[in-house]
Curated annotation (Swiss-Prot):
The modification Pyrrolidone carboxylic acid is found at residue 22. GO terms for molecular function: ion channel inhibitor activity; potassium channel regulator activity; toxin activity. This is Potassium channel toxin alpha-KTx 1.6. Has the structural arrangement of an alpha-helix connected to a beta-sheet by disulfide bonds (CSalpha/beta). The keyword Membrane does not apply. The record marks 57 as: Aromatic residue of the functional dyad. It comes from the Eukaryota. Potent blocker of both large-conductance calcium-activated potassium channels (KCa1.1/KCNMA1) and voltage-gated potassium channels (Kv1.3/KCNA3 and ERG1/Kv11.1/KCNH2). GO terms for cellular component: extracellular region. It is found in: Secreted.
Amino acid sequence: MKISFLLLLAIVICSIGWTEAQFTNVSCSASSQCWPVCKKLFGTYRGKCMNSKCRCYS
C-alpha cells in the first residue's frame, strides 16, 4: 500500500508540466505589449508583463 502511494505520488510529480519562463529587459505596462516581443525573441506569443518587464513562456 505504501509503495503504491509513493509510485502514484512520483507519477503525479513527473506529469506536472513545468513552464520555462524566459526573462527579457524590455519594459512594458501591459501584457499585450509583450506578445510581439516574445514572438520576435522566442517564437511564441505567450508572455506577460511582470514588474514592468516582459516575461515569455515556452
